[in-house]
Amino acid sequence: MLDIQQLRSDLQNITTCLAQRGYNFPVSDFENLESQRKSIQTLTQTLQAKRNSASKQIGIAKQQGEDVSTIMAEIANMGDALKQAENQFESIQTKLQQLLMEIPNLPHNSVPTGKNADGNLEIRRWGTPKNFDFTVKDHVSIGEHLGLIDFETAAKLSGARFCLLKGGVARLHRALAQFMLDAHTQENGYNEVYVPYLVNADCLRGTGQLPKFEQDLFSVLTNAQDETDNVDKTGMVGLHLIPTAEVPLANIVRNTIVPLEQLPLKFVAHTPCFRSEAGSYGKDTRGLIRQHQFDKVELVQITHPEKSYEALESLVGHAEKILQKLELPYRIMLLCTGDMGFSAAKTYDIEVWLPAQQTYREISSCSNCEAFQARRMQARFRKGQDKPELLHTLNGSGLAVGRTLVAILENYQNEDGSVTIPEILQTYMGGIKRISL
């Protein structure tokens, strides 16, 4: 969420910056609400001053033995008017808050301007795509040849965009997640966290998925079981399946003041992620690239504002190192203003090479959200007895497990349909060096 004081003082510049993101800021709505707010605020202050003055007159009149009934009646009327004005003021504040919750973050000044992915900027590449001396298969053909990826049965169980992984491929998927967790906790200084996969709406508002992207979420309604449950008007508890572990990890510091000496906080979690993929009809309908349920190892850093861009570069490096250890070619893309996520001020995408598609595909997205999420979550830090300040939050995939599996199946395939296990994963696979029939 943007700082409303910044909006009030620099509206034109902010409107221009948001337009670069493709967001048309409702200037007239904001100015109308601001005008009403100022008017009612002035009225409230005037009524409060008059009531205070009248209250003093009562004391003086009583000392002089005068009748105070008329003044008492005036105070009562002013009290009613004041209550009405306060209710109106609260209503306007709520509308302003709702408007703010719909506004995306401001792009950092280093972000290139662009309308869509065509405006993204390639930063660097690592590794050279392998030249195969046979016709490469995609991961679906490889998995089905091995009998270890089953979309048909998954569709019977759940519907489209689900899969069953079996045998060696299922074990490879598990090995990847374990390898990533070990690397991030043992080498990169992250603390592993096991998080709930169901979260309340406050969490999703904090990280920016709500209210704007509710259609992308899977929601669950159940009967209240505990007095701490968030019960709606029907007596039901509304929860959401997490679209990413960023949501529970970042919300660890919601409504919290973190002592300065504890920063940075670095969290990692391996979770399933659930997305409805609304608006993705017809995109990546084949294979594991775009599923309703997929696993991801998520990295979150909570930092001092002056350290967040240094942290972003290190976070990207942590995700890169996984691909380097797996010897998978990739490239780093700096996203343009029109292709960034709602909460991000700056985002790097890491794209891995998929030989069957002869292109690079996103496998990680690493973002600095600056104070945008922290303001929504009221996540702050404090040095000693100083006034609390907003934290900066960062997140990134380290990595998407399913897409890493896809990259290994395709980049490590052999002519006979088998798949070689990357050397670094062989200990996680119990010494298995190849998946074959």
UniProtKB/Swiss-Prot annotation:
SUPFAM superfamilies: Class II aaRS and biotin synthetases (SSF55681), tRNA-binding arm (SSF46589). Keywords: Aminoacyl-tRNA synthetase, ATP-binding, Cytoplasm, Ligase, Nucleotide-binding, Protein biosynthesis. Its EC number is 6.1.1.11. It is an enzyme of class 6 (ligase). It catalyses: tRNA(Ser) + L-serine + ATP = L-seryl-tRNA(Ser) + AMP + diphosphate + H(+); tRNA(Sec) + L-serine + ATP = L-seryl-tRNA(Sec) + AMP + diphosphate + H(+). Gene3D superfamilies: Bira Bifunctional Protein, Domain 2 (3.30.930.10), Serine-tRNA synthetase, tRNA binding domain (1.10.287.40). GO terms for biological process: selenocysteine biosynthetic process; seryl-tRNA aminoacylation. It is found in: Cytoplasm. Pfam families: Seryl_tRNA_N (PF02403), tRNA-synt_2b (PF00587). GO terms for cellular component: cytoplasm. ATP binds at residues 275-277, 362-365. L-serine binds at residues 244-246, 298, 397. GO terms for molecular function: ATP binding; serine-tRNA ligase activity. CDD domains: SerRS_core (cd00770). InterPro entries: aa-tRNA-synt_IIb, aa-tRNA-synth_II, aa-tRNA-synth_II/BPL/LPL, Ser-tRNA-ligase_type_1, Ser-tRNA-synth_1_N, SerRS_1_N_sf, SerRS_core, tRNA-bd_arm. Pathway: Aminoacyl-tRNA biosynthesis; selenocysteinyl-tRNA(Sec) biosynthesis; L-seryl-tRNA(Sec) from L-serine and tRNA(Sec): step 1/1. Belongs to the class-II aminoacyl-tRNA synthetase family. Type-1 seryl-tRNA synthetase subfamily. Consists of two distinct domains, a catalytic core and a N-terminal extension that is involved in tRNA binding. Catalyzes the attachment of serine to tRNA(Ser). Is also able to aminoacylate tRNA(Sec) with serine, to form the misacylated tRNA L-seryl-tRNA(Sec), which will be further converted into selenocysteinyl-tRNA(Sec). Homodimer. The tRNA molecule binds across the dimer. HAMAP family: Ser_tRNA_synth_type1. This is Serine--tRNA ligase. The lineage of its organism: Bacteria, Pseudomonadati, Pseudomonadota, Betaproteobacteria, Nitrosomonadales. The gene is serS.
